[in-house]
């Protein structure tokens, strides 16, 4: 396990086909702030939806059972400003590992993202990919982030 600038990179077993997946820890205080935001903003919560081409977002509990709050990339309220700073640190470390991606376009968070709570037995129960429903836009996406806040 190596460390860089306060970030901890968790080394995974060596694999024969590079999958470009890396993991880092986001500081506990930032994660706690996101959880607190979710808990304190009940009016923003909604049932999780599945995005289907031609239908948009539909609630299908057999496919996905969650409670979500959608966060706009322009939401610079606490704790999301600190979270984005940490994501940028992770991206900077990722670029050091895979420098060829820095030759491509600049990276930024352009899609809304979700804070999702899955009840016991809930979750995404079918195969899916992470996308925002604008199917053609995501064809060229080359980096996805997920932050798990469970203990």
Task: Report each predicted region and the residues it spans.
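Fe(II)/2-oxoglutarate oxygenase catalytic core
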Residues: 1-151
């Amino acid at each position: 396990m190596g460390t860089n600038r306060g970030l901890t990179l968790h080394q995974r077993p060596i694999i024969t086909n590079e999958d470009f997946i890396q993991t880092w820890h986001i500081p506990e205080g930032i994660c706690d702030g996101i959880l607190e935001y979710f808990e304190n903003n009940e009016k923003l919560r909604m049932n999780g939806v599945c995005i289907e081409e031609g239908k948009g977002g539909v609630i299908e509990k057999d496919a996905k059972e969650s409670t979500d709050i959608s966060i706009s990339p322009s939401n610079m309220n606490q704790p999301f400003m600190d979270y984005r700073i940490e994501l940028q640190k992770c991206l900077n470390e990722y670029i050091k590992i895979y420098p060829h991606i820095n030759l491509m376009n600049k990276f930024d968070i352009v899609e809304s993202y979700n804070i999702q709570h899955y009840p016991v037995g809930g979750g995404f129960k079918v195969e899916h990919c992470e996308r925002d429903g604008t199917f053609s836009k995501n064809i060229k996406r080359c980096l996805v982030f997920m932050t798990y806040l469970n203990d």
